[in-house]
């Protein structure tokens, strides 16, 4: 048995058919012409985490238990994020899988075939005992255990935190050509209260065309208006403990001293929670295809909505996310001999959120 599934989140068949008639999607049209083409029934509600879980399990939302982005805790009526349920144990609060239903990935391995799930929604945290190889998609938190917002830092005092979801910060000038700031990291208990760990960074503006971001042990050359490569952000939690996240940075405007960081995301090789399985697979993918963003919603719609980045910068980020997933998929495809290999591309959904309708 050899099955390959390529999922496109928010793919509207009616729009596809209109573009197909105009001969604007020749490759997808060829797939439809060579095989069979059918419309799928839409889940109710028609939400990404509901639809993909129904597709993976063959169950309706009432059976698999995911029926909205927000659920109600029946014990106290508080609202909670359905994709990030937690449980308390002797080791503290831990994330637990958002559903317990059997998927076709599980069925494949029960039947003796390997199965790989790439960026499928509602697959975080990884089930470490499961033989299904997986990289999680929608529902993967940032290193704070939240859905994730970025950090925007500026010399200006005109920005008001109340008007932004993104975390605001101040850049301090040290001489004519140097700015310093801090990134907020995970929290730790101190004196009975949560205190967030901070990491310092600096911007060397000696060359206006290529400012240098100094953070941790890295010196990253920036080009105003362009995204940096993915880099690591270290946080010191205590004498013997530390944590690392990953992010990308951009100086959105060429003529201003402002910098924006994507949400601080899980480093897949140093995750505080079970991120992906098996460890050998994620390590090989990371080292052979290059770093990739790990947040469940990596296309930063918030910063675009708030006017921190512009349309072109957002779309460039989206294209680069697609390219990184393609590299991992093609690497897995090269090794694929039998079983199930599935991947979900969700950038189409994020672009429609911002530009369609």
Feature locations, PLM:
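Extreme N-terminal starter segment of soluble prokaryotic enzymes
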Residues: 1-4
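Short polar catalytic/cofactor-binding loops
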Residues: 8-12
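Second-shell loop/turn segments in exported
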Residues: 14-15, 94
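Short, glycine/acidic-enriched capping/hinge loops at junctions between secondary-structure elements
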Residues: 15-19, 354-355
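Short, structured active-site-proximal loop/turn typified by the sulfatase FGly-forming signature C/S-X-P-X-R
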Residues: 17-64, 116
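His/Asp/Glu-rich, glycine-adjacent segments
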Residues: 59-357
